[in-house]
Amino acid sequence: MASVKVAVRVRPMNRREKDLEAKFIIQMEKSKTTITNLKIPEGGTGDSGRERTKTFTYDFSFYSADTKSPDYVSQEMVFKTLGTDVVKSAFEGYNACVFAYGQTGSGKSYTMMGNSGDSGLIPRICEALFSRINETTRWDEASFRTEVSYLEIYNERVRDLLRRKSSKTFNLRVREHPKEGPYVEDLSKHLVQNYSDVEELMDAGNINRTTAATGMNDVSSRSHAIFTIKFTQAKFDAEMPCETVSKIHLVDLAGSERADATGATGVRLKEGGNINKSLVTLGNVISALADLSQDAANPLVKKKQVFVPYRDSVLTWLLKDSLGGNSKTIMIATISPADVNYGETLSTLRYANRAKNIINKPTINEDANVKLIRELRAEIARLKTLLAQGNQIALLDSPTALSMEEKLHQNEARVQELTKEWTNKWNETQNILKEQTLALRKEGIGVVLDSELPHLIGIDDDLLSTGIILYHLKEGQTYVGREDASTEQDIVLHGLDLESEHCVFENAGGTVTLIPLRGSQCSVNGVQIVDATQLNQGAVILLGRTNMFRFNHPKEAAKLREKRKSGLLSSFSLSMTDLSKSCENLSAVMLYNPGLEFERQQREELEKLESKRKLIEEMEEKQKSDKAELERMQQEVETRRKETEIVQRQIRKQEESLKRRSFHIENKLKDLLAEKERFEEERLREQQGLEQQRRQEEESLFRIREELRKLQELNSHEQAEKVQIFQELDRLHQEQNAQSAKLRLEKRRLEEEEKEQVQRVAHLEEQLRKRQDTAPLLCPGEAQRAQEEKRELESIREALLQAKEMRAGGDHTCRDELERAQQYFLEFKRRQLVKLASLEKDLVQQKDLLSKEVQEEKVALEHVKCDAGGDPSFLATDDGNILGGPPDLDKIKTAETRLQSREHQLQDLLQNHLPALLEEKQRVLDALDSGVLGLDTTLCQVEKEVGEKEEQIAQYQANASQLQQLRATFEFTANVARQEEKVRRKEKEILESQEKQQREALEQAVAKLEQRRSALQRCSTLDLEIQEQRQKLGSLHTSEWSGWQASLETDGEALEMDPARLEHEIHQLKQKICEVDGVQRPHHGILEGQAVLSSLPPSGGNSHLAPLMDARISAYIEEEVQRRLHDLHRAIGDANHTPADVMKSNEELHNGTTQRKLKYERMYSRSLGTNRDDLKDPIKISIPRYVLCGQGKDEHFEFEVKISVLDETWTVFRRYSRFREMHKTLKLKYAELAALEFPPKKLFGNKDERVVAERRTHLEKYLREFFSVMLQSETSPLHINKVGLTLSKHTICEFSPFFKKGVFDYSSHGTG
């Protein structure tokens, strides 16, 4: 067992951190790493001091932040410290794993892969591995087989980096072998012979790896890469076979990243999410393994069941053996030294600290047969030791010695057999490894490659070519082309005039045909072909201008060899390309003259050979020239490529320079914009100051001009007053006459208003009488019947609840209790049906009686009208009214009133009482037809009926109280009318006396003025005194007259306001009567009553406004009476009242009036001061927080519900059960609420903070949707068209007691 080795490496600061002026927060001393939190002030003691610096101890701490530091650790030192252990473990037969962990841009890829000038761990480990392999192979100590694979995990999908592009790039699946563990299906494995092969594959994989630029790293790895080396070694150690298989996982992880720091969006954001998901799973695996290791270290502690979530991520699944399994694992935590990355760095250090506690179980992975051989040899040695220790003579004779010796021989034979089998298998493996799919055989000093399939052998005149290229032509079609073809080619070639899809070799039953594609250049034996051509043994094929091959057909060659042995063919013909022609004509020629023919053919063949040799030489020369041209062109391409690279590097440098310059320019632009904004603000402030100063100057100038104008007016006024004194006398006479006429008109108007008031009171009395006529239709026993039925239903409910409790307690007698309760309920329904039938019969009789009375009243009314029509004393006026004797007219009105009353009663009976009774009877019949129901159903039905009975009883009580209130209101209105009449009579007397006094005073004043004016005219010496007296007299008259005029205007306004006020009060009383009329309807007409009420105006449509209406009427009447009495006293001019007394009485009167107004405004402002625009969103509700209440078993959470209705706001505290009760109750009344999603009840976790926080959000959403539905529902009392401007806190509380603030709701410690 071995723990995971953990190393921490800190990188230098990058350009981004330097631009942010980040501080260095990492210190390393030997194996200790310390991180400092600069946000906590230095010098703190206690917890704050400990929180400022945190120190961790690891196996290794690599300080690579400063190359000039003596403690600087280079790539080479990291390899010597960690990489040599990996190579050593691999040669010992252990699995090994190295992975780097850290945030994005912390140096993971640099540590693992390095760069072109400074290789990382992966290249150095591979190089060291093959260096040791070569050293071992040189001394023939062992043989090795090495396979590599390279994959990446991108967006939780596995991709093979060493496979050429195809449609299955990301479709590799991860599976798990029961013994070998997780593996990737169809992952390509590549045999390598040396480090250059590994380096080539590694470079190819790195090119295919997914990288992108983010806000924190220009070349950020967007995937996890795993480079795996499967290393097999076999050798004989002291004649003991030894075979071990090691897997080395070299992992380069992508970095964890925050979206706000990297600025990732779109694809980058999705990649970052998948990267973080796999890294979080890796952290969870590390934590779980650390917990398991700690439990294993403490055997006395009870072990916990810890689940390790390997399969939550593809990364952790593939590294299952490396984390807590059969592997020697090294974790390298890479961190940033900057304070801007403090959180990520601390998280990385904590994960690394947890990883130290993981315990792995590495074992040597040896072959099963080798292990068995080793165990058998150990057993043989033990048996030989036993035989050598005992008495040889005694043991040889005993049966035990014979059995031991026999077992010894069996084991030795088995060891030899297994050793031979293992040696043959390994040698065969090595031969297959060397020979691949070809058969090698030695012929003299040469080596012959044999193959059974048709194949092509490359003819290459490249001076640097040292190998032989052989391509098999499989059964079917073999495609030849370039690497950039749209489809994958079986044979990939390069050269001049070679098309991307050049040709096809078709092998059909041993016959091979060459098919050129789209006019490609193909030659067979020097002849250009354009159509499909069959190939024969030895054919020379030229594809393009530089790719030449020889076609070999083993089966055809074997047939030709057989024919040559039989003497049918010459030895020369087998080596030339015109073999087919010779085969066709040879038989006939040989039969004609075999000897001469042979000599002739030999000469022809020699000539042909010579010509072909020359042709080949020419072709070779041409090929050399073409090759030289190709090399020249390649050199030119290489030169241009290098120049392109130089230009690209310059472009990158220029781009970086442009980026830096643009960054500086942006910063300068930002500074300039900020300076411009400051300048604009200062300029605006200066402009505002100047504007304010200009306004002040204009105001002062305006005031000066006004003062000047006033002075001028005053001067002119003083001049004009002298002239107006004499004109005032004439005007006083005229105004006296006009005022007298106005007072007479006021008297006449008061008399008319008195008549109208009397008529209104009579009309109100008539409406009250109609309402009283309708009231007898209500059966007096209805309330008593409802009370009795409620008591019976409550007893049934108690019985059902008792049966339910007995059933929950497991009592076996609960069934009998349930049956008795249900039978009692059915008996109650039967009695109720009998009562309803009796009521129905009474109502039918009452309907017949009312119908009969209506007919009689109609007949009587007709008789009265006929009698009145024949009387000549009745005269018809222009407007159609009948004027006659008062007794006859009273009879007609009385008869019409009785007829309307009876018709109204009959209509109310037919439309409301009778249908409601039939509906209730039908419900009882349905309940009886359904028979005995379940406990819960019966209990629910009983609960519903109890609620209905309670509503009926409350409705009856409200009807009675409202009828009584209506009567009291009528009496009060009649009293008010009588008081108004007295006030008007008193006002008439006051006006008459006032007019008389005013007339006398004016006459005396005019007489005095006339006398004094005549005296002034006679005596010129007294002009100044007369002028002064005139001014005094004029001022006196002016003040007196203005006082009288103001008094008269006040009286006139009061008199003008009286009809409007009285008319408004009568209108309010009418609305109230209509409201009471709607509420007085019986319980089975509730819905119809609500519909009628909803059609009334908003100001009088709700019954809860009745107290406000009474208070308003009382306040206005009291105010008017007090004002008129005060005016009366002031008009009389009581001599006993001093000015101080008058002011005191006025103040008292004003205070009383003000108090009454304030009282009324407080009571009625909510229903009158609302704007229509506020009804767009009248109710706002939220749950800002929740509190923990109670102790022990009663501990629970309560939610603070904040309700705002227009300008009223209040708060209640409710627990979750109250929400659920309200939802269940209102859902039965309003079907629309059933569609709302209510947060479900949970059996566990009700006291968990996360559950409560989530429930708070759901409840808040539910309440908002709840009010939205109720405001739009036609059946809801909160419908916006019904409540209108009267929507208030009172309306919401009446709708449901859930929103009513109770006694314990004034703090957060209520019971909810």
UniProtKB/Swiss-Prot annotation:
SMART domains: KISc (SM00129), PX (SM00312)
Residues involved in ATP binding: 102-109
This protein's domain notes: The PX domain mediates binding to phosphatidylinositol 3-phosphate (PtdIns(3)P), phosphatidylinositol 3,4-bisphosphate (PtdIns(3,4)P2), phosphatidylinositol 3,5-bisphosphate (PtdIns(3,5)P2) and phosphatidylinositol 3,4,5-trisphosphate (PtdIns(3,4,5)P3). Does not bind phosphatidylinositol 4,5-bisphosphate (PtdIns(4,5)P2).
Subunit structure and binding partners: Interacts with PTPN21. Interacts with RAB14.
Main localization of the protein described in the UniProt heading: cytoplasm
Residues annotated as domain Kinesin motor: 3-358
Stored CDD domains: KISc_KIF1A_KIF1B, PX_KIF16B_SNX23
InterPro entries, per database record: FHA_dom, Kinesin_motor_CS, Kinesin_motor_dom, Kinesin_motor_dom_sf, P-loop_NTPase, PX_dom, PX_dom_sf, SMAD_FHA_dom_sf
Domain PX: 1177-1291
The name this protein goes by in its record: Kinesin-like protein KIF16B
